[in-house]
């Protein structure tokens, strides 16, 4: 085990603070509509130009181990805020640095870090409650959603508008994904209904030769969790569907051999219009998705587990959909005939699974299933002229998407750092059990001005003048950094999601309090180069004598 270096109390905290300052100073220049760019070197290819705080923070590793620990702890603030709310990372970094800076002054004056921590926690709780209960307004209309997206995407109105369109089309439960597009403009693709990535098992099922798609109107849908290889099992169902003159979609683990050949022949002769696809997913997820399709279409999964066999199945066990579209790669079911109550019960069941799940991957897949049942899936294709611009723009669109989700969830507050200034009202008259706790409350009060100060500094204005003017106002009155004017920020469309502002404050206070109560730091000793490390090879000169061995 390598030898360690240990630093204690003030020495440890000062080194940590140095690392915090280096990271925070690099990140905070990107804050706001008039924030500056940061340029990140890449090991190959062109450097990345970004105004995204998290991207800058992720790149920073410091040489000094103790400074690096401070920087990494501050990084945790932005990544936690990003995980919970999807945005507000730069604000959280600015707040944490400010709380820590003010706290270090109090520690230098001989105050107890534990009492300061209690004061910080008390102030944070009061301010967070004020944000959620007093300031927050619901965000429901398209206009508010577009404004939140615009602000989060660094004042890019096109991004805000496309996110609002996507949410309008797939609903608040719908899944919206961001991909790299092929053109210069942003595009929105919306898939309504249930889509899964399995295509037709034979090109002979195609009904439209130009698009190479199979389209079935008012289709009956057979769901089976086993392989189908014997056509005799299917005959009763095929006859029943043919009598009703309806097309049939078969979704099974596999359709092969004689069964597939017979279906193709029947389809080509026009006896019964049919198409077959493999069931989506694998293992337990496949069973769950088949059940989702059954509930969506009002059908039943033919499965041994519930004592049903294919030869005993009737037309009543089949699901129904207004339209089914099948391409080589995917199948889309639109207008399933399932009962609304059954679908909503299934959605609640999946949501309960999401609450219990600890895996982000599982949660994402469960959320996709909810979207396919109730909303749909929208894909925003980001357009840009160059690879560098594409990456930067995609990161901004993803940020904006997270922010709008947070706004829909918990509501909105006036943006531009104004919400935190208004939340200072919650700290008026608030005092701790002793003087040191009261000082903890005071340093949070000072730190809550910092995001507005930084926004104004980045815009090249006088921060103190603006902060005082904003404090004199009430409600949504604040400073619009983009235009340089004072006014009602909600009307001007300068909004922040409540969840983002609240999470930024809570995470910043949590990590700053942790750092202030740090009393010892342990790190690996810097590796020393062995002096004269190459000198040992000198002895090899004697090998010249080996010539005598010939």
From Swiss-Prot:
It is found in: Cytoplasm. It is an enzyme of class 5 (isomerase). One of its GO terms (biological process) is protein refolding. Residues 525-550 are annotated as: Disordered. InterPro entries: Chaperonin_Cpn60_CS, Cpn60/GroEL, Cpn60/GroEL/TCP-1, GroEL-like_apical_dom_sf, GROEL-like_equatorial_sf, TCP-1-like_intermed_sf. It comes from the Bacteria. Its main location: cytoplasm. Pfam families: Cpn60_TCP1. PANTHER family: 60 KDA HEAT SHOCK PROTEIN, MITOCHONDRIAL. Forms a cylinder of 14 subunits composed of two heptameric rings stacked back-to-back. Interacts with the co-chaperonin GroES. Belongs to the chaperonin (HSP60) family. Together with its co-chaperonin GroES, plays an essential role in assisting protein folding. The GroEL-GroES system forms a nano-cage that allows encapsulation of the non-native substrate proteins and provides a physical environment optimized to promote and accelerate protein folding. This is Chaperonin GroEL. The gene is groEL.
